[in-house]
Curated annotation (Swiss-Prot):
Subcellular location: Secreted
Purpose of the protein: Inhibitor of voltage-gated potassium and sodium channels. Among other potassium channels, it selectively inhibits Kv10.1/KCNH1/EAG1 (IC(50)=236 nM) by shifting the voltage dependence of channel activation in a depolarising direction, it shows a maximum inhibition of 80% at saturating concentrations, it shows fast on-rates, and is poorly reversible. It also slightly affects channel inactivation, when the membrane is highly depolarised (>+80 mV). It shows similar potency on Nav1.7/SCN9A (IC(50)=222 nM) and lower potency on Nav1.2/SCN2A (IC(50)=519 nM).
Tissues of expression: Expressed by the venom gland.
Descriptive protein name: Mu/kappa-theraphotoxin-Ap1a
GO-annotated cellular components: extracellular region
Protein family per UniProt: Belongs to the neurotoxin 10 (Hwtx-1) family.
Entry text on domains: The presence of a 'disulfide through disulfide knot' structurally defines this protein as a knottin.
Primary site of residence: secreted
Length: 36
């Protein structure tokens, strides 16, 4: 049920997996600062 910080998939909308991270809409996953 839990998701990994780097590999928690996300969408254009707020996602619990990206609580402390940034959802990279370019790649579709959660990253630390969006530069990935």
């Amino acid at each position: 049920g839990d998701c990994h910080k780097f590999w928690g998939w996300c969408r254009d909308e707020p996602d619990p997996c990206c609580e402390h991270l940034t959802c990279s809409t370019k790649h579709g996953w959660c990253v630390w600062d969006g530069s990935f």
